């Protein structure tokens, strides 16, 4: 079982109740017009207040909370953060990746999962570019 949430406090409390449940931390640092971000200084979504410089290293925070999956908005991810997440044993999943160049970039970054509105498109891109990602 994997439970994911934007609210780190819920995931932290869940760990105390049942440490065997896998927990995924959903993050959004760049505000979208339709969605409010949850990662910012003094965010009520976080377990505690983190200094701004730590918020750029979310895999460190998720690891410290003994998370299992980092699920982030694809525009917030960097190759370095994916590598850091993997170093901590975290799977990385990005959302909502729909454009070809973004899909290819996420695969090149080494993410473990892509959430998209067009799964067939991801398959076709991988096949056309001879990328064995599945």
What do the PLM-derived regions correspond to, one by one?
Residues 1-134:
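Short loop-to-alpha-helix "cap/lid" segments that border enzyme active sites
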């Amino acid at each position: 079982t994997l439970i994911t949430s934007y609210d780190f406090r819920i995931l932290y409390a869940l760990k105390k109740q049942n440490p065997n449940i896998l927990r995924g931390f959903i993050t959004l640092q760049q505000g979208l017009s339709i969605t409010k971000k949850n990662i910012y200084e003094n965010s009520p979504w976080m377990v505690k207040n983190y200094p701004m410089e730590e918020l750029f290293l979310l895999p460190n925070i998720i690891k410290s909370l003994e998370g299992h999956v980092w699920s982030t908005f694809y525009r917030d991810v960097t190759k370095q953060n994916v590598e850091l997440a993997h170093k901590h044993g975290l799977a990385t999943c990005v959302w909502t990746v729909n454009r070809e160049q973004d899909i290819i970039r996420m695969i090149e970054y080494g993410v473990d999962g892509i959430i998209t509105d067009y799964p067939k498109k991801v398959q076709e891109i991988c096949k056309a570019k001879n990328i064995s990602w599945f």
